[in-house]
Amino acid sequence: MAYSKKVIDHYENPRNVGSFKTIDANVGSGLVGAPACGDVMKLQIKVNKNGIIQDACFKTYGCGSAIASSSLVTEWIKGKSLIEAENIKNTNIAEELDLPPVKIHCSILAEDAIKAAITDYKNKNK
């Protein structure tokens, strides 16, 4: 199985690695995992008063495809509304990174992490 150049780039030079303070009201955190392979993904968003994701970061324990998926989506969601970010599908991620079929679960984790972070943000700001 060969990784695409985009996967290798995001794995070797991951963007937006880090974390925000979870107590901040404008921060939403999503923690998801895939027990089958041991991948764990934490994705956080920082949302401005207009409902736009102004920043995003991640910490992922997992394979190169999981790290690349996390890195890619943090780039994609910056500047998007919550609704736009929620509409990102794992198929978009898998296609952009040219993930092999055996690694599709990594793109599913990234989609789930986005949704979990948005849900957390919404729950904190009801």
UniProtKB/Swiss-Prot annotation:
InterPro entries xrefs: ISCU (IPR011339), NIF_FeS_clus_asmbl_NifU_N (IPR002871)
Gene Ontology biological-process entries: iron-sulfur cluster assembly
Gene Ontology molecular-function annotations: iron ion binding; iron-sulfur cluster binding
Alphabetical list of Gene3D superfamilies matching this protein: 3.90.1010.10
Any GO CC annotation of this UniProt entry: cytoplasm
Role played: A scaffold on which IscS assembles Fe-S clusters. Subsequently gives the nascent cluster to other proteins. It is likely that Fe-S cluster coordination is flexible as the role of this complex is to build and then hand off Fe-S clusters.
Assembly and oligomerization: Forms a heterotetramer with IscS; each subunit of the IscS dimer contacts an IscU monomer.
Family affiliation: Belongs to the NifU family.
Name recorded for this polypeptide: Iron-sulfur cluster assembly scaffold protein IscU
UniProt source species: Buchnera aphidicola subsp. Baizongia pistaciae (strain Bp)
Gene: nifU
